[in-house]
Amino acid sequence: MALRKELLKSIWYAFTALDVEKSGKVSKSQLKVLSHNLYTVLNIPHDPVALEEHFRDDDDGPVSSQGYMPYLNKYILDKVEEGAFVKEHFDELCWTLTAKKNYRADGIGSSPLSNQDAFRLWCLFNFLSEDKYPLIMVPDEVEYLLKKLLGSLSLEMGLGELEELLAQDAQSAQTAVGLSVWQFLELFNSGRCLRGVGRDSLSMAIQEVYQELIQDVLKQGYLWKRGHLRRNWAERWFQLQPSSLCYFGSEECKEKRGTIPLDAHCCVEVLPDREGKRCMFCVKTASRTYEMSASDTRQRQEWTAAIQTAIRLQAEGKTSLHKDLKQKRREQREQRERRRAAKEEELLRLQQLQEEKERKLQELELLQEAQRQAERLLQEEEERRRSQHKELQQALEGQLREAEQARASMQAEMELKKEEAARQRQRIAELEEMQERLQEALQLEVKARRDEEAVRLAQTRLLEEEEEKLKQLMHLKEEQERYIERAQQEKQELQQEMALQSRSLQHAQQQLEEVRQNRQRADEDVEAAQRKLRQASTNVKHWNVQMNRLMHPIEPGDKRPTTSSSFTGFQPPPLARRDSSLKRLTRWGSQGNRTLSVNSSEQKSLNGGDETPILALASQEEKLDPAPGN
């Protein structure tokens, strides 16, 4: 079922690419070509008559996606066998069809993405997209993929930058809930998400994430492996997948040297160092034990953890780590959505309670108003009784009997009024008690609001602290960039100085070559100048002392004047007019020998006793100019 969903996502892009008019329908001829290509890449026996028979009643018109879907399920997807085809070739077919109509890369080559990188990002998008059409990738998965790519580049992106980046692309109702694949590719081509990252670095990062998520490569790298027959150690490129650990002759993975099958009964153990190998561990299978050695302890820990993860997946019956992680992330998003809905429902319930509370407060106000009216009526009644009593007292003198009767009737009426007053006081007491309970509920509500405000203030304070820390990190990053620029400037100055010294050395070597030629010409006259050797040796010693003071090994950064002046400034002394030809010849030969000895000592001082000065200088340049990879 999972494989069918993955295949349907790619086929959906191919089908929509053929739908030029955006009407949801594709002509039958185009569907024939698409079906034939799907048969080929999926290694399914081709049935050319099935499509005609399936749509026999619709020979003239186009075929919609609903009409093509039953044929696709019955004749293609139901016959697909996992492992019988190369899924990458299938994805390349669908990408080729959809990229021609929808993807427009920069034609002049300035786009950060090559066609291969765009294809791999398209596959990653299909893997992480939701199982709903049209296919979109939610912001959580976009953030997950960007963090994967940045992790491969050893970079980091703040949550604020990512939210700002996604907010810039929220231009339609669709982007409010996610990104389409073309918006996703445009995000990379625009260079907004990975500023300052080279095209080659980005391509390597995309390839690494593609191998990890799509090809289920848990880990890969060089390890030393011990052989089973000759028991010698050889360095191999290992590639770990959930079901096997393969090793190759090089990282191009062209020459496969072997495969270590992994199952639930395998185990990995750390071994002590021996035989000159350190950071050793072994993988034990049912039939054999494989010994390996990592470059350091950290690499060994990563490899053992990755192999244990693969064994755990085999024990749990799972075929892909990232499919399991994707399902867990999807379940977490659903849980967050349910919690959000529950929170909204709780807020709605609290709002209803608040409305009920306001309604009861209004009823309480009405009861208080009724109480005030009852008190006012009671006072009016009391005043009326007093006036009647006074009238009765005035009439009592003249009509005693009538007064007695009136008094009796008045007493009965007073009893009734007292009972009514008692009932009114009891009602007032009940209303006062209800008012106290409502006031207590109001105080609890006020306290809850104050607690909520305190929590909100604490959250605001934490956000301000996080912004301050982010500013500090950005300041540190700027200082590091300034330090790198200063180091590069110093490096350029050292390189210029080394180039100047190299030119001086070449000039000195040319002069040495001229001296050697003079020596060859002077060797013919050496036999005639033997009588002057002692005097010439004295002069040679004098010249050697002075030249040794001037000529020292050229060190990096040494700003001494070039030594070529000591050779160009040397001129033979003029001959006296009355010197004989023999004296001139002898004197010229002694000067040639002295120049030869001076230049030989100069060459030794330049070379520092070594006959390869240029190699020594080159090694100094290599020390000053480290390789870009370091």
From Swiss-Prot:
PTM comment text: Tyrosine-phosphorylated by tyrosine-protein kinase LCK in response to T-cell activation.
InterPro entries associated with the record: EF-hand-dom_pair (IPR011992), PH-like_dom_sf (IPR011993), PH_domain (IPR001849)
Induction / repression: Up-regulated in differentiating Th2 cells and down-regulated in Th1 cells.
CDD domains named among the record's database cross-references: PH_SWAP-70 (cd13273)
Phosphoserine carried by residues: 590
Location relative to the cell: Cytoplasm; Cell membrane; Nucleus; Cytoplasm, Cytoskeleton
Tissue: Thymus.
Modification sites for N6-acetyllysine: 225
Region entry Disordered, spans: 318-341, 378-418, 552-630
Top-level taxon: Eukaryota
Pfam families noted in UniProt: PH
Location, primary (coarse class): cytoplasm
PANTHER family xrefs: DIFFERENTIALLY EXPRESSED IN FDCP 6 HOMOLOG, SWAP-70 RECOMBINASE
The protein's role, per its UniProt record: Phosphatidylinositol 3,4,5-trisphosphate-dependent guanine nucleotide exchange factor (GEF) which plays a role in the activation of Rho GTPases RAC1, RhoA and CDC42. Can regulate cell morphology in cooperation with activated RAC1. Involved in immune homeostasis by ensuring proper trafficking and availability of T-cell regulator CTLA-4 at T-cell surface. Plays a role in Th2 (T helper cells) development and/or activation, perhaps by interfering with ZAP70 signaling. Required for optimal T-cell effector function, lymphocyte homeostasis and the prevention of systemic autoimmunity.
Subunit architecture: Interacts with IRF4, activated RAC1 and F-actin. Both the phosphorylated and non-phosphorylated forms bind phosphatidylinositol 3,4,5-trisphosphate (PtdInsP3). Interacts with ZAP70. Interacts with RAB11A.
Name of the protein: Differentially expressed in FDCP 6
Originating organism: Mus musculus
